């Protein structure tokens, strides 16, 4: 696929494969068949007149947006052992797209990103590669405790978030457009109380 249609098409097809949509396999197949039959090469994704290519484009765009939002909105918390822990609950299976981003930016940290909906843990050990663990031996049932330092920082951050807001300029509609409700469940500044996992 990479040789025939280019890196952009390959990446888009990978995003579609991570989609939660039921017709993703059909869209991928129709896109590849269309590209091969019409010999479109690197211009495959530009042919949006084809229903398969268009469906692939729409799904890849939706997955790409969710990846982008999670890169912005993911919040790590320090656990008692010094490990950074983050929970996400994405619609699509995007954890493999997020890990290279965070592994590149946090190479000296031990961290875990937990996809709660799929029960997938992405683990990164400092100065090493990252890997995925699917439904490990009860990892989802272990009680994680947030460090005391993290509790203090979480409280300070939440207080900062709520006190910096200007009451007269509140715009909940705009806030919903910029930060949909489904991302807030896992964000420190929107939690009522700091909790242990």
Question: Where would I find each of the regions flagged by the language model?
Answer:
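Extended, well-ordered protein cores
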Residues: 1-197
């Amino acid at each position: 696929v990479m040789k025939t249609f280019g890196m952009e098409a390959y990446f888009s097809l990978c995003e579609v494969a991570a989609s939660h949509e039921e017709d993703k396999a059909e869209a991928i197949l129709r896109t590849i068949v269309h590209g091969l039959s019409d010999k479109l090469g690197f211009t495959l994704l530009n042919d949006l007149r084809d229903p398969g290519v268009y469906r692939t484009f729409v799904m890849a765009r939706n997955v790409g947006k969710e990846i982008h939002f999670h890169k912005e909105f993911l919040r790590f918390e320090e656990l008692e052992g010094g490990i950074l822990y983050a929970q996400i609950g994405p619609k699509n299976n995007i954890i493999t797209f997020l890990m290279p981003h965070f592994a590149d930016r946090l190479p000296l940290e031990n961290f875990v990103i937990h996809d709660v909906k799929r029960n997938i843990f992405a683990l990164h050990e400092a100065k090493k590669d990252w890997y995925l663990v699917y439904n490990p031996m009860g990892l989802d049932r272990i009680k994680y405790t947030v460090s005391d330092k993290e509790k203090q920082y979480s409280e300070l951050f939440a207080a900062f978030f709520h006190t910096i807001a200007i009451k007269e300029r509140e715009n909940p509609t705009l806030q919903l457009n910029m930060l949909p409700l489904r991302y807030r469940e896992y964000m420190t500044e929107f939690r009522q109380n700091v909790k242990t996992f």
